[in-house]
Amino acid sequence: MLKVLRGALCVALLGAVSGMFHAGAQDGTRTIEIHAKRFSFSPAEITLKKGEAVTLVLTSDDVPHSLVIDGLGVKGDMIKGQMTKVNVTPSKDGDFQGKCGRFCGGGHGSMRFTVHVTDN
């Protein structure tokens, strides 16, 4: 009887955890994964629509970094082995430049990221 209860509990927990990871897709929010490594972002540019809610999922593939996009109010730490979620809904169109906000070595200044926001 105890084995049956443990099995049922495991199935229930897996279902609950699975539901948490799919919540972003169910509410209509687009998710974009962005990785950082010395000395680049991948992808290096993305395109968003004005007024579109987007979740950026940030992670580092090596040392600590951060993504800063001043024109969109984005700032998120990027730590190896961790995911940082940053929500953004652009209110104006145009091109916005991002950069690494945490010194990560000699090529730090070359870490650039571009967000294109379209009106349609």
Predicted segments, located by residue:
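Extracellular/periplasmic metallocenter environments
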Residues: 80-120
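C-terminal segment of classical bacterial N-terminal signal peptides
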Residues: 15-23
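Beta-strand cores of secreted/periplasmic/IMS beta-sandwich domains, seen most often
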Residues: 28-33, 44-63, 82-92, 96
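Bacterial N-terminal signal peptides that target proteins for export
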Residues: 1-10
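A mature extracytoplasmic/lumenal domain signature
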Residues: 36-38, 52, 60-62, 71-73, ...
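Surface-exposed loop/edge segments in extracytoplasmic proteins
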Residues: 75-77
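Short structured motifs
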Residues: 40-42, 71-73, 83-85
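Short beta-strand/loop motifs in extracellular/secreted proteins, especially
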Residues: 63-65, 113
